């Protein structure tokens, strides 16, 4: 079962520059209750890479557009009330529908 985000990460993200795409992604994922394990699979990166983005590290050009679109979709669905995910099953189903394949 995926773990929730640590309070340390939540505090770091809240203090980080929101103009960084990775920080915006982290805020969206935390607010939407999407586990990093599933988000990493959806973005086709490792959890280590995902967490480095969350902390403001640069995102390679080939991934940056995907991250920005993903973040926009999650923020939009949160505003519509489709998120936050109620549990990990809901989060997994949401991401599987988004990417069109099993996680």
List where the protein language model places each region.
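DNA major-groove recognition helix of helix-turn-helix/homeodomain DNA-binding modules
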Residues: 61-80
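Short alpha-helical "recognition helix" segments of helix-turn-helix
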Residues: 38-40
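Recognition helix of helix-turn-helix/homeodomain-like DNA-binding domains
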Residues: 45-59
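Helix-turn-helix DNA-binding elements, focusing on the entry/boundary residues of the two helices
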Residues: 25, 36, 64
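A short, Lys/Arg-rich alpha-helix, primarily the initiator
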Residues: 2-32
């Amino acid at each position: 079962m995926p773990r929730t985000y640590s309070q340390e990460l939540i505090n770091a993200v809240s203090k980080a520059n929101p103009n960084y795409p990775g920080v915006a992604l982290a805020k969206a994922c935390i607010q939407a209750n999407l586990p990093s394990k599933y988000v990493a699979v959806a973005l086709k990166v490792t959890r280590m890479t995902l967490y480095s983005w969350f902390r403001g590290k640069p995102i390679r050009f080939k991934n940056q557009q995907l991250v920005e679109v993903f973040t926009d979709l999650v923020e939009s669905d949160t505003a519509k009330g489709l998120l936050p995910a109620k549990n990990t099953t809901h989060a997994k189903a949401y991401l599987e529908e988004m990417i069109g394949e099993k996680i």
